[in-house]
């Protein structure tokens, strides 16, 4: 396909001007983690602008500590009747760690439940005129261009209709390494420019080297263009945001000169598989309870989840530059889970970090299958465990350290739960197979009886289950109380049925995820790096043999644990069955939950429905229509051969190549770049050059105007007569 064959691309001039605006370089230096930088923390502009209420911390964190101390005391009392053995001490220690983890979530849930009972409304700032400039950033890495560019198209158009569009510029920041996807991005950008250039300023840049992944992508933008803008609104490749939410974030940031970062709580949408629908439903019913409670008590010491948030550019560039950690990955090198760290550093510098739990209209998508969730969690697990290197950073607020610690525990809790199960099983087997030593070596007139307080143990079990499922219960109570909310998910009866189904299916999946997280932690401790692979976002299906291979150890672990339990008694096996059944049938669970067809069956039945699915926001419907249109626009992908052949297409491509200077003369040349230079130089024609270039090398050529010009000068094909005439 040539340029002239596409009505959208009838000109060699890039519609709307340059692919990127003129640079305005600014400094974003890596922060020193071993000492507090000079001038930090800054003085707040408004009196008490970054001060939080201690009473809220006391109620939630203090309540969690008191609840944990009570539970630990009760567990100790269960064992103390006959004297506590070393194995029982281990059970007590593991129980203490795990209970503290769920107690904090429970107390946050209580706070969120009480707030949501009052149905708080978002602060209305619609009348505020925006005099600040915001760059809306959409980083992408080997994603489907139709998804990314159609979302930007719809959001830009709806934002332009608010009267505030002049205050925003849009940037698609590509780190794509696949040459085919890179060319599709350029095709999609041309369509996007054609649609939006009259009402919005939309830009595109693909980095030559994706150093430091997403954090490096955003940092590169800040150093080159960040000084042009007051704020950065960071999205993800699957993000959508209503125009009222975008303007609301900018207005809140403008109204609060001490705000460094404002994070929304995104709703999950567009789930097509059963697994995605399960996550959507749980996040919609129970998520607001935890999110609202968290935002209420952390106050000005909130967190950043990497996207769907607005950041003050000054705060980000002066305080959140990420250093490289000493050593090699997985614990050294670039900071992977950058978001938590950036929020902590911004707060350290004296800016507030707020979770806007009252602001709706923020959306994202979720992994479609257990395997896709495992791939994502492997990367997140490495990043969160890496935070153990960040915890000692000088000057961090204790709540920021708590965010880092809870992120670490999100994955370490699985090994702790597994160890608790194993030690409890060992206690049962010990009591069954090992004869008690009633009289020890120490002189005593009375024997040592291996007994436990069974009534207290059962009571503690019920308390633990109440704490564990408390946030779910709070979410269900809010659902039942709010008739409008209940109707939006299909009515109270279907909602209750969906809750029961979600609890059962989640209970089956939980032990699988526990072993997945245990495996991730183990591989990280063994020094294995996760790498960076693009995410699947739609169909989660996989061949059965692949699933058997991926879940083989989970099934084996379930069989071994079941065998150990039955050695003691059928009663113990029955008690452990909720955790074992999921492991035994891990493969069919993984297959069924990753199926779009099964997801569609549940959608038609109205099970696991959410308000966003039954009555989607207008922007979600527009995004679906726009994506279908973009798929048609780029149905005939460009190729590098076409770019070299068509001069007009070449000029359009070069107009979208990053203008960052190439390697300066005299500086060392990287191995791959040298190899590409040799291949291009030795090629007799374009066809032979393309035949010897691999995909990574093609991506490099696409980003290098000099190499492209060299290839363009070559004949399209090599003809023997050319060699004769040359001789």
Curated annotation (Swiss-Prot):
The keyword Membrane applies. GO terms for cellular component: plasma membrane. InterPro entries: Glucans_biosynth_gluTrFase_H, Glyco_trans_2-like, Glycosyltr_2/OpgH_subfam, Nucleotide-diphossugar_trans. It is found in: Cell inner membrane. It is a multi-pass membrane protein. The chain crosses the membrane at residues 58-78, 97-117, 278-298, 408-428, 460-480, 496-516, 572-592. Keywords: Cell inner membrane, Cell membrane, Glycosyltransferase, Membrane, Transferase, Transmembrane, Transmembrane helix. Its EC number is 2.4.1.-. SUPFAM superfamilies: Nucleotide-diphospho-sugar transferases. Pathway: Glycan metabolism; osmoregulated periplasmic glucan (OPG) biosynthesis. GO terms for molecular function: hexosyltransferase activity. Pfam families: Glyco_trans_2_3. Its main location: membrane. NCBIfam families: PRK05454.1-3, PRK05454.2-1, PRK05454.2-5. Belongs to the glycosyltransferase 2 family. OpgH subfamily. Involved in the biosynthesis of osmoregulated periplasmic glucans (OPGs). PANTHER family: CELLULOSE SYNTHASE CATALYTIC SUBUNIT A [UDP-FORMING], GLUCANS BIOSYNTHESIS GLUCOSYLTRANSFERASE H. This is Glucans biosynthesis glucosyltransferase H.
């Amino acid at each position: 396909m040539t340029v002239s064959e596409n009505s959208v691309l009838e000109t060699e001039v890039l519609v709307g001007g340059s692919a990127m605006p003129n640079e305005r370089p600014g400094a974003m230096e890596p922060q020193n983690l071993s000492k507090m930088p000079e001038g930090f923390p800054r003085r707040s502009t408004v009196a008490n602008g970054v001060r939080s209420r201690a009473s809220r911390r006391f109620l939630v964190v203090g309540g969690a500590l008191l609840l944990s101390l009570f539970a630990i005391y009760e567990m100790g009392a269960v064992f103390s009747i006959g004297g506590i053995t070393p194995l029982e001490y281990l059970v007590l220690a593991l129980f203490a760690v795990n209970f503290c983890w769920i107690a904090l979530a429970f107390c946050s849930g209580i706070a969120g439940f009480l707030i949501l009972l009052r149905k708080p409304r978002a602060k209305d700032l619609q009348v505020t005129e925006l005099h600040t400039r915001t760059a809306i950033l959409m980083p992408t890495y080997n994603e489907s261009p139709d998804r990314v560019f159609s979302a930007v198209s719809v959001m830009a158009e709806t934002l332009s209709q608010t009267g505030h569009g002049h205050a925003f510029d849009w940037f698609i920041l590509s780190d794509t390494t696949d040459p085919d996807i890179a060319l599709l991005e350029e095709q999609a950008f041309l369509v996007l420019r054609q649609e939006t250039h009259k009402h919005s300023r939309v830009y595109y840049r693909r980095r030559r080297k994706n150093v430091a992944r997403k954090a490096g992508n955003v940092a590169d933008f800040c150093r080159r263009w960040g000084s042009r803008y007051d704020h950065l609104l960071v999205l993800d490749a699957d993000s959508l945001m209503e125009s009222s939410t975008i303007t609301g974030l900018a207005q809140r940031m403008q109204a609060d000169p001490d705000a460094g970062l404002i994070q929304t709580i995104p709703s999950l949408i567009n789930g097509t598989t059963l697994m995605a629908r399960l996550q959507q439903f749980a996040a919609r019913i129970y998520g607001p309870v935890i999110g609202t409670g968290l935002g209420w008590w952390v106050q000005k010491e909130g967190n950043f989840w990497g996207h769907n948030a607005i950041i003050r550019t000054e705060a980000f560039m002066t305080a959140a530059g990420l250093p490289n950690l000493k050593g090699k990955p997985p614990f050294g090198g670039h900071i992977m889970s950058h978001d938590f760290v950036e929020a902590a550093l911004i707060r350290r510098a004296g800016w507030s970090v707020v979770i806007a739990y009252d602001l709706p209209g923020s959306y994202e998508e979720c992994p479609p299958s257990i395997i896709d969730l495992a791939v994502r969690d492997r990367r997140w697990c490495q990043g969160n465990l890496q935070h153990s290197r960040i915890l000692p950073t000088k000057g961090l607020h204790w709540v920021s350290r708590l965010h880092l610690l809870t992120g670490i525990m999100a994955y370490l809790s699985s090994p702790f739960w597994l160890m608790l199960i194993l030690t409890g099983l060992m206690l049962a087997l010990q009591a069954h197979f090992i004869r008690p030593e009633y009289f020890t070596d120490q002189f005593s007139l009375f024997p040592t009886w291996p007994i436990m307080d069974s009534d207290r143990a059962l009571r503690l079990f019920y308390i633990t289950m109440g704490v564990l499922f408390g946030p779910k219960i709070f979410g269900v109570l809010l659902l039942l109380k709010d008739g409008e909310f209940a109707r939006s998910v299909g009515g109270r009866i279907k909602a209750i049925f969906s809750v029961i189904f979600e609890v059962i299916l989640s209970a089956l999946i939980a032990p699988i995820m526990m072993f997945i997280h245990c495996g991730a932690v183990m591989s990280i401790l063994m020094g294995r790096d996760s790498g960076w692979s693009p995410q699947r976002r739609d169909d989660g299906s996989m061949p059965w043999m692949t699933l058997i291979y991926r879940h083989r150890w989970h099934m084996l672990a379930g069989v071994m644990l079941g065998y150990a339990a039955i050695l003691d008694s059928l009663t113990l096996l029955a008690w452990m069955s909720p955790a074992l059944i999921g492991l035994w049938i891990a493969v069919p669970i993984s297959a069924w939950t990753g199926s779009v067809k099964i997801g569609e069956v549940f959608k038609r039945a109205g099970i696991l429905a959410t308000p966003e699915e039954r009555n989607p926001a207008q922007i979600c419907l527009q995004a679906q229509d726009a994506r279908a249109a973009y798929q048609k626009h780029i149905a005939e992908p460009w190729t590098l051969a076409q770019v070299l052949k068509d001069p007009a297409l070449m000029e359009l491509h070069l107009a979208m190549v990053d203008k960052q200077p190439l390697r300066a003369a005299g500086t060392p040349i990287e191995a791959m770049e040298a190899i590409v230079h040799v291949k291009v130089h030795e090629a007799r024609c374009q066809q032979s050059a393309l035949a010897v270039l691999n995909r990574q090398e093609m991506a490099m050529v696409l980003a290098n105007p000099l190499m492209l010009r060299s290839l363009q000068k070559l004949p399209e094909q090599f003809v023997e007569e050319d060699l004769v005439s040359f001789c």
